[in-house]
Amino acid sequence: MSENQGKWALILGASSGFGAATAREFARAGWNIIGVHLDRRGTMALVEEVINDIRAAGVEVVFHNVNAADEGKRKQIIAETVGLLRERGEEGRVVAMLHSLAFGAIRAYVDDGDGAITPANFQMTMEVMANSLVYWTQDLISSGLMTTGGRIYAMTSSGTHRVIRKYGAISMAKAALEANIRQLAVELATHGITANAIQAGVTDTPALRKIPDHPNMIGRILASNPHGRLTVPDDVAKVIVTLAVPATAWLTGDVIRVDGGEDIVG
């Protein structure tokens, strides 16, 4: 029997990029997967590929195509998961959660000809990319889905300390996300649950390609990264799954760089 049998990983943003890679990696390690994603008909074929890969690993998979930042949908997923795990006799077995929601406003602060960022843009970006981590964590704890031994991870970026054109609102949200991780790490210590941020290197994902300056970013990293390549989602997924073990109980409140040394060379 696998030591991971009966464990579940909740992946927010499970259909592409870091979320999809981490869902696949957890599945290969024997974890069951609950995925939350928001996709339209045009990208559902890619979602089905992720689901099929998880099933091929011989584990259970439940995907929800909803807005993870919607309170009603979140409550519904939590309730359905409580019922599912209770039926299986696996209460309290959501052992890991990855917050990998990449949806925010990419606009200049000062009108550059394409319009300036608005209060609604700021609010949406903060709610999706930072605050939703807290809401999901609250519900996991209060519902009893996650208990002692739980591991919470959230994807951050070097945008917390670098300026990228039109990335200001996301930089703000990622900085807040890291603050949320620190606060959760302290508050969850008495629950035996850890919380850490994962700072990936520049990765060629759909989210990156929405940034206007992404071609220059890719060129700069290819020239400067000590390994001579970009980070890929599997690099990050392997680290997250490796860390989701009892031996990392003393590792919490950190920002863990997974970038091949990219950030330290500028």
List where the protein language model places each region.
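A conserved structural motif in NAD(P)-dependent oxidoreductases
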Residues: 225-236
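Aromatic pocket-lining residues of Rossmann-like dinucleotide-binding sites
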Residues: 26, 188, 243
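A glycine/serine/threonine-rich, flexible loop-to-helix segment
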Residues: 46-49, 166-169, 190, 202-225, ...
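Catalytic loop of short-chain dehydrogenase/reductase
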Residues: 102-190, 202-203
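Hydrophobic structural elements of the Rossmann-like NAD(P)H-binding subdomain
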Residues: 98, 153, 195-198, 208, ...
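Short C-terminal tail/terminal secondary-structure segment
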Residues: 240-241, 252-266
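Conserved SDR Rossmann-fold cofactor-binding beta-strand/turn motif
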Residues: 194-204, 244, 257-259
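Short-chain dehydrogenase/reductase
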Residues: 2-96, 103-120, 210
